[in-house]
Amino acid sequence: MTPTLRTLPIGPGPGFWPELARQLIDAAPDLSRVRVLVPTYVHIVHLRQALAGHLGSSFIPPEIRTLSDWLAALPPGDEPPPAAPGERLMELYAQLRELGWLKKLFDAKRNTDLLPLARTLLSLADELTAALLPAALAQPEDVEDRWHAALQQLSPQAAALLSSESQLVWNLWHAQRDARDPGVVRHAMLQRLARSADRPLFWCAPYEPGALETEFLNTHAQHQPVTVFRLDWSAHALPLTWQRCWNELCDDSSTGAVTLTVPPALPDSLSLHPARSLEHEAQSAASTIIGWLQQGLQKLLIVPQDRVVARRVRALLERAQVVVADETGWKLSTTRAAAVLAAWLDLVAAQGRPQPLLDFIKSPFLFADPDAEGELRLSVERALATGELPSGWPGIKACMDDLPEAKRLIDIMAREAERFSGRRTVPEWVAITLGAFDALGMLAAMKEDVAGSQVMAMMESLASECEAIDAEFSLAEWRALLNLQLEQSEFVALRVDQRVRMVPLNGVPLREFDAAIIVGADAAHLPSPPADTLFFANSVRRELGLATREERARQQLRDFACLLMSCPRVVVSWRTQIDGEANLVSPWLQRLQLELRRETALVKEAVLPAHEVQVGTATFTEQLPQMPAPRAPALLPAHLSASGYNSLMACPYQFFASRMLRLREAEELSELPEKRDYGQWLHRLLQRYHETVAEQGTPVEQRAALMDTISDEVFAAALERQPAALGYAMRWKKHAPAYVEWANTREAEGWRFAFGEQERKVTLDIAGHSLTLMGRLDRLDKHDDGRLAVIDYKTADKGALKKKLASLDDHQLAFYGLLMSPRPAEAAYVAIDSDKTEALTAEPYDEWCDALEQRLVQDLEGIARGEPLPASGVSSSCQYCDARGVCRKGAW
């Protein structure tokens, strides 16, 4: 047999595999003595089924495999092992970060900005290798001539912008193309395979072979015959409708004269589903898939042109217990395991700031017991929110003194975080990161999780690939590398059910499905937006033999046509409106519709049919909500504060939810100081000021200096933890003289500071229940004549305080009177955050206290008797109420 290479085109459509099987049987009666290469393992199944259709169940099949599988089985040769992706990336990055001119050229503000650039440069170098390596090895001068000819295609303006970047890529390609270049190694292995060929080869692929594969086939044909089966895109192999609408599908342009007099045929397989919204499109797609399954269809396809819609479809199907075998590949960065890794590195970089700590302890891998996880997380959050916001690990630890389990965990975190310092090699960074997870007890849980095990494997692979690199990297560079790897890696989910598959459009050719639905087939997503061709203009790519935008768009259209011709049912779905604006269907379908409508006189049904979706309905009994008014005498609280009683007065249901059921939102943790923190600082410094004056008898003329000293000390400690407190420090410095002047005047009137910041309690008997009233007094003054006065510091506006006292809506001062025996003679709010400090006295105070005592006992006894607690609060009380979502005001 004389070795030959021949090409046999087969038209796209459902008959591709049966025709290939027939031609294979005709060409090789003894199938066991030939080898067939197909693109993927799925195609192996299709070919075997087609052969069985011709030969029956009893036959010896040919050797059917993929090219990658064949290469992997090749015994080691003289080629060195190819450089691993991680090794190539970090070696190139380590070189690029030393080039100051390169940072200036690409406007890189930080070294880490060069890491994505390094990946892009390597990708372009690999693309050049795949297209030009055989020519570069055979005739290097011709390749250089092609390069210079390509640059000549640029306009002078484009050349001025792109010449430096393009030359950089070209030089990098020459520098990277050594014996360990993956493309060079692959080429050598392919040639070794071809030279050792021992049987005829049948090559089957939906696309034209690349330069390396073409060289492989040519070499193989010199030793054993090669037959290439490819898709036939000539005019005679395509339906006339497709030729009329999409003439760029064809390899030749001689279709017009043949088809002008022939009316276009309405495609039998295609129907359209215009959706009103994203949710409507997703629900319709999910209902369509479920309907097909109920009809007994077993091979269903979802083409996710719009990933947002596709995610929603998948969620709806999983809710219906229909598992989707996703071949599109979700980014590993979107998994919760990757989020935990990112949260840990954020915490390390933040050096123990509270918010990153709270984000990290939400990790599902950190606690073996979910109940303990919730309790510990809540206790840590409360500990951080109750006092001043701590800064750094020492401050965090100090907040956990009453939480031994939390403190133990924080100690481990702080110890492990200290190891993330300095510059280290990639394997060292991997070891430190995995060591931290092990110390925190997370490693086992991560490995048991599907995504977690893949994240661990990715890091271990990265360490192995970069073992030979001596360059050291900072924590910021390590984080950037991990983020890049997680973004580039695909999450491979376990596939249990294979009936419904989600496959990208370029994975559809030569595959068989019973029905398919394309979601997101609007003009923005079908065809997919062209990928950026950085560094090389389209004309340069064309001259060098690289894929151009036009070629990629044409290939997308051919993939789409393959689906329409091979699948008996295809539904195309899209949203007709987005944000109130019209959203057009894919231009490919617009062209098809126009072509059909143009021939209305010849074709009765000139419009593509609409897909009817059968959505299941459910009947519910309507029950109008009513205002809640629970009765809960058994839940009468054992303790009550002034704010708690104010809540009862504002809305009984709010009191029921917050004080009796204890349904309170966790306080939000802000890393910036708030007015609450400002109030705590003022309370602290005023307490110190008055105690010092009382103990030392500080003369009046020295008190302003004393206030400045104490204020500086208190705010210096605050600024050390939170530099953003500077604004509050300057604010108090402006108002402090007014307070000192007011305090001196009050002392001259006979009032003396007695004590401050003191807890007071009193126990009442409420219908047989013991209930303790409790509160913390800011300050108590005693007059020379023996009278007592309650002082409460306020940073609120004077007008708001006066309004509060006049309306008697706030019972705080009167409530404090109930805690004192003997009862104070007067009480006042002191507005301290003002240019003029002023005491706003509650009058008549004694009558107010008596009325409050009578009403408080009456209200609490009513609760103990089982009186209702209606949601009767006014709008101002509801505006910021945590129980609003529980009482559902507005729905009744």
Where do the PLM segments sit?
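Nucleic acid-machinery interaction/catalytic patches
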Residues: 1-544, 548, 597-601, 667, ...
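Short, glycine-/Ser/Thr-/acidic-enriched flexible segments
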Residues: 13, 43, 208, 233-235, ...
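Active-site-adjacent bridging/hinge elements
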Residues: 262, 535-541, 652-663, 708-712, ...
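C-terminal, charged and often intrinsically disordered regions of DNA end-processing helicases
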Residues: 286, 293, 590-690, 874-875, ...
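C-terminal accessory regions
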Residues: 365, 546-597, 816, 857-880
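Short, contiguous acidic/charged loop-to-helix segments that flank catalytic cores in large enzymes
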Residues: 469, 491-492, 547-551, 669-673, ...
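Non-catalytic protein-protein interaction segments used by genome-maintenance enzymes to assemble
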Residues: 755-823
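Metal-dependent nuclease catalytic regions and adjoining charged, substrate-binding loops involved
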Residues: 817-892
